[in-house]
Amino acid sequence: KALITRQIEDFCGLLHGAPLGTAHRSISRSLNFLSGEALQTALSTYRAQLYNPESPHYNEGLYSLILAWEESSMKVDSAQKVAAYLQRVRLQHNAVGRTAQDFLYHTSDTTGTVSRRLSHFSAPYTLLVLSVDSDKRNQQWAEALHRHKALYRLVQEKHLRPLVVYTGATRPDSTLRSLWSGATLGYDSAKLITAQRRYDLSHGSALYLLDAKKTVLLRNTSIPKIATYLHARDEE
């Protein structure tokens, strides 16, 4: 088991940069040779390496090849096939290059609590934070944003507008409100994000970068990656 895990981890490192067709054939060959517990170990390792945003090998395109293999393979049961299919469909939601799925959220203004839609959130770039209860990354992202002077300057200039939506019962305390000063704080009161699974929150809180038309530019990303991306766009 440990050997298979290590081999798959090393293999994932080699897959990056390979043409998609080559990667597809290589992944299929690696899985076709396995069965039983060894196969399940390989699949779980692929998931940990390719579908965990914290992994250096994170790549949803490659992970979708794993799901496609599960769907078509005779080595997995029907329940696993269905689960793979549903996950692959969800991967297509809010994918990079697609329009972010719209949702209703509640926020406060001078008149009290009001309903707003993501699609009506006006900004050249939107930093969308979907905050999950008990996940500390919401605060970590806010702190990282403050530390990154160039990126925080874009926030002050309203070129980049943070929209922080709380998807659970937790509400921001005074510390978070201070850290997200200048951001729009919203709440998933209609439960469209969680109940209808409009966004994948299986990893916990999620961070997206959207353009003015709400096209997804980056997802499951980080503050440094957003800064690098926007700097490159400005250089174009």
Predicted region positions:
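Short, internal strand/loop/helix patches
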Residues: 175-208, 212
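Active-site proximal loops enriched in glycine and acidic residues that flank catalytic Cys/His/Asp
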Residues: 129-133, 164-168, 187-189, 211, ...
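Short active-site neighborhood of thiol/selenol oxidoreductases, capturing the structured segment around
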Residues: 114-148, 161-165
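Oxidative protein folding and maturation machinery
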Residues: 1-113
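Structural microenvironment flanking redox-active thiols in thiol-disulfide oxidoreductases
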Residues: 139-179, 190-195
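A structural signal for short secondary-structure junctions
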Residues: 121-122, 155-158, 199-203
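Non-catalytic, surface beta->alpha helical segment in thiol-disulfide oxidoreductase systems
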Residues: 203-206, 212-236
